[in-house]
Amino acid sequence: MDINEHIQLWKAEERIAHIHGWDFSHIEDRYAEEELPWDYRQIILDYLKPEMRILDIDTGGGEFLLSLNHPHENTAAMEAYPPNVELCSRTLLPLGIDFRPGTGKKPPFEDTGFDLVINRHGDFNAPEIYRILKPGGLFITQQVGAENDRELVELLCGQTEPPFSEQYLSITSQKFRDAGFKILDAQECFLTIKFFDVGALVWFARIIQWEFPNFSVDTCMNGLLNAQKQLEQNGCIEGRIHRFLLIAQK
């Protein structure tokens, strides 16, 4: 395949890059991440009891929340991204789940209303989490760290400022301590992510626009050509993911 054919394929991926909820199935067999050293879902299930009232902040399309199989009458969720708000309104509300549009900075829920608040890769505000939790309530979060995908971003887009420069476990833990929480568990890791074709990386970069600012095939052509060379030399395009886990108790 010559380079012009590659470019046409990359532009095709660019055109179709969209997402419902948080569904990466389009590139499922075209990239791979190392497994995290913890199981976020299992950690939640270890704490969860049917009588608990739970809230999922930044629920995406609600897919993960529904996988917990928690009683719907004790389940609440919130989301700010308009396409996902529409999706959740269609899927969660008819089930009896208390879904409300809103951001993690100011959850639209009453004081001391929840036994457990969960948040995977979403926004949060430690004092607000404290406000909506019952005494003894738990906050469990898995977060994307400040250094996530930085090698890939620099490969395609050059030097850019990280979008969330304070996203480190140490900084986040201190914010929760300052808000009055006790830290029960705190873990952080840096793991490998690999892409097996450049088109998959194009789709990925278009989806995660906040990490890859102003990315397009045309504006980042030199970076994409370098990515293609790296792929041909190494069999993959490699970067790092940055994640951390925090469990805090009110």
Model region roles, listed by residue range:
Residues 1-25, 34:
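N-terminal, positively charged/glycine-rich alpha-helical extensions of SAM-dependent methyltransferases
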Residues 105-116:
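A short acidic, Gly/Pro-enriched loop at the edge of an enzyme's catalytic core
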Residues 182-250:
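Conserved Class I S-adenosyl-L-methionine
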